[in-house]
Regions:
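Active-site-adjacent loops and short helices of periplasmic peptidoglycan-processing enzymes
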Residues: 17-180
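Short amphipathic alpha-helical "recognition" segments used for binding
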Residues: 6-7, 66, 316
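Hydrophobic h-region of N-terminal signal peptides that target proteins for export
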Residues: 5-17
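Domain-terminus/edge residues, biased toward the C-terminal soluble/receptor-binding domains
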Residues: 162-332
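A general, composition-driven signal for non-globular sequence regions
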Residues: 12-13, 56, 303, 311
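N-terminal hydrophobic targeting signals that begin at the initiator methionine
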Residues: 1-2
Length: 332
């Protein structure tokens, strides 16, 4: 008789090799005041500098605005743009007063063109007010482990106020979380979007054209924050997120770092999200589970699943072609 075991696993339960756990600050090619590269599955730091330094992050905070809108399950609602939306300064999608747009349209305008008018319209519709929406932003930040983040608005403002404060690490955590949302992933990776009655919006994220494995990203800039950029990429099963704060050549830096780590590491998947048929058992996992291995050990290995006599999954093991055994213990 087949059995179903439900495995409750946190992001931190993913096993990785020891040589991926050191923070390497030796990169001298690019300048970034703060940067971090993390494994999106377990949020482990692969490399970084000033990763927990709190500072203004500009428009990359709109990733949070977008994910809250998408998680409201109201993306096909049609919204009448308020008058105040037309008065927002900075980047805009040029909404007219009383113009009707879907929440989905607004999310595209927010992510591709960084529209502050889109951010205002989203925030007042979903939150009832800017303050109400900001509470949702900070609540979500706390929920997903952004320990050094405080949002004060739905867009980027840091001219006459403190602005949205966060860290490179926290923003990479946010991008890792957001990219698990199907709609966010689709929007963030879209290079152009035609909004009826308004315009065709071209994505400001140049990394989409520069690097084929890019999953998406968000740019930002203010005089206080300087250039900010958060992105994600996937290759050989390995999902990585990167954030740079005050980096002048950020697109090139992100591409360089992705190429660096994808040339060294790969991901071996043992369990996918949902039901997995393993031998005579069905295993349900809340997350995808696996291990990160050096790229040279990515192929020709063997995956083993160890069950107890009663059919309980005890651990999983990967045996490389040179005999190294790497175990994933589920119940530590």
């Amino acid at each position: 008789m087949k059995k179903i075991f439900i495995i409750f696993l946190s992001l931190l339960s993913l096993a990785t090799l020891k040589n991926t756990k050191t923070i390497d600050n030796s990169n001298k090619t690019y300048f970034s005041e703060c940067y971090v590269i993390i494994n999106r599955d377990n949020l482990e730091v692969l490399e970084g500098k000033n990763i927990h330094k709190v500072r203004s992050v500009a428009s990359i905070s709109k990733v949070m605005t977008c994910i809250i809108a998408l998680e409201s399950n109201r993306i096909f609602d049609v919204i009448v743009a308020p008058n105040e939306a037309t008065k927002q300064i900075g980047s805009s999608i040029y909404i007219q007063e009383n113009e009707k747009l879907s929440l989905l349209d607004l999310c595209y305008g927010l992510m591709l063109r960084s529209g502050n008018d889109a951010a205002y319209t989203i925030a007042t519709y979903i939150g009832g007010s800017i303050d109400g929406f900001v509470k949702k932003m900070n609540s979500k930040a706390s929920e997903i482990g952004m320990k050094n983040t405080k949002f004060t608005n739905a867009s980027w403002l840091d001219i006459d106020e403190i602005g949205n404060l966060s860290t490179a690490y926290d923003m990479a955590v946010l991008m890792s979380y957001a990219l698990e949302n199907v709609w966010f992933s689709k929007i963030s990776k879209t290079q152009s979007y035609s909004c009826k009655h308004i315009n065709t919006w071209i994505n400001k994220n140049k990394l989409l054209k520069m690097y084929e494995y890019t999953d998406g990203g968000k740019t930002g800039y203010t005089n206080k924050a300087k250039r900010t950029f958060v992105s994600g990429a996937t290759k050989n099963g390995l999902k990585i997120a990167m954030c740079t704060l005050n980096c002048g050549n950020d697109f090139e830096f992100h591409k360089n770092m992705y190429e660096k780590y994808f040339s060294r590491l790969a991901f071996i998947e043992f369990l996918k999200p949902g039901i997995n048929q393993i031998y005579d058992y069905k295993i349900e996992s809340k997350k995808r589970i696996g291990i990160v291995v050096p790229i040279e050990k990515f192929k020709n290995g063997i995956k083993l699943y160890k069950f107890s006599s009663s059919g309980q999954l005890l651990y999983m093991e990967y045996i490389t072609d040179d005999g190294e055994r790497i175990k994933v213990n589920l119940y530590e």
